[in-house]
């Protein structure tokens, strides 16, 4: 039985708390911390889990095996470095931090202590994603021809009116680092990191915000495969993110929680679950917690078996670097 603590009790905590309650035969929540007394009280009343009012209480308790860091991105480096110094494994909400330089320092702090760092990029855990990864990695679909990602979401102005939302200082970026990171992470898992990126990046009249809410990018891989990235939070009312793969022996579409593979021999294969992952529209938390539970289960397995999680710090750095390249190309 592992003992864990939660740091950060804002919007992101709900799927994690539900996941931990589901996994109560494997893990026990020792503490839940927020500097806000109101958030601590609301969390304790809703989930019936113990709370504390000092981060030091968690770090000094040697019985705590791991910490879930669910705080704003610009706080991640400091908190994770303190967790590493205290010998705690960490499950970290995306992104790693607000810049790749800070993200690299964060990952090093955990690796240098031989601690497990798992990053919450839960779309990797979808059965549909895993099936497509398998088909491409095994060569069953043949050589990759094209790979594209479409992130067509809606966020009202009220979303960006929240303090720090969409700013470089707190979030590190806009649609790519906050929303598109999930789909781009899956794209890399399927196709690898592209060799060349050319892009356009802008902020539309739909939003008043510091960072980008619309990106169009062209990608080229060493294999000569091509692709595009289209990401926005201006697409009312929002549609599920999707990835389209063209390969030698078939074409695949991954949308929401379902993948459809159309083989050249006439077969059609479906993988995953019917429905949608949710979160495409104004209600950003309108999604099931199944894949967060899968992240937690994989994290616990990684600790117990002394192996890397599915999305380690090193894996998460790949998508950070791709986002940097897209933004730099777009000026």
Locations of regions flagged by a protein language model:
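Active-site loop of classical SDR/Rossmann-like NAD(P)-dependent oxidoreductases
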Residues: 35, 283-297, 311
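Hydrophobic residues in well-ordered beta-strands that form the structural core
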Residues: 13, 53, 92-93, 117-119, ...
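Contiguous beta-strand/loop segments that form the cofactor/metal-binding neighborhood of enzyme cores
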Residues: 184-260, 293-307
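C-terminal helix-rich "cap/oligomerization" subdomain common to oxidoreductases
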Residues: 66-69, 222, 298-331
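Beta-strand-loop-alpha-helix segment that lines the small-molecule cofactor/substrate pocket
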Residues: 66, 72-73, 77-124, 139
């Amino acid at each position: 039985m592992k003992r864990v603590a939660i740091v950060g009790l804002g919007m992101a905590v709900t799927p994690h708390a539900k996941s931990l309650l589901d996994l109560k035969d494997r893990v026990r929540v020792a503490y839940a911390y927020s500097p806000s007394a109101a958030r601590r009280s609301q969390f304790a009343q809703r989930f019936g889990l113990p709370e504390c009012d000092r981060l030091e209480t968690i770090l000094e308790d040697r019985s705590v095996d791991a910490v879930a860091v669910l705080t704003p991105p610009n706080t991640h480096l400091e908190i994770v470095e303190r967790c590493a110094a205290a010998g705690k494994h960490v499950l970290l909400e995306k992104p790693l931090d607000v810049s790749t330089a800070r993200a690299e320092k964060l990952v090093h702090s955990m690796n240098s202590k031989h601690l497990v760092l798992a990053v919450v990029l839960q779309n990797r855990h979808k059965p549909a994603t895993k099936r497509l990864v398998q088909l491409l990695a095994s060569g069953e679909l043949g050589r990759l021809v094209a790979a594209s990602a479409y992130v067509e979401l809606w966020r009202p102005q009220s979303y960006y009116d929240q303090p720090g939302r969409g700013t470089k200082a707190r979030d590190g970026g806009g649609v790519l680092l906050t929303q598109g990171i999930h789909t781009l992470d899956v794209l890399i898992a399927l196709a690898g990191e592209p060799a060349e990126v050319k892009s356009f990046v802008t902020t539309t009249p739909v939003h008043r915000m510091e960072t980008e809410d619309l990106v169009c990018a062209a990608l080229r891989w060493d294999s000569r495969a091509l692709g595009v990235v289209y990401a926005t939070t201006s697409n009312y009312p929002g549609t599920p993110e999707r990835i389209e793969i063209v390969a030698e022996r078939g074409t695949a579409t991954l949308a929401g929680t379902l993948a459809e593979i159309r083989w050249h021999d006439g077969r059609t294969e479906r993988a995953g679950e019917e429905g949608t992952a949710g979160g495409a529209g104004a209600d950003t938390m309108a999604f099931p917690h199944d894949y967060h539970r899968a992240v937690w289960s994989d994290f616990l397995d990684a600790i117990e078996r002394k192996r890397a999680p599915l999305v380690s710090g090193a894996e998460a750095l790949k998508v950070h670097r791709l986002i940097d390249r897209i933004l730099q190309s777009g000026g």
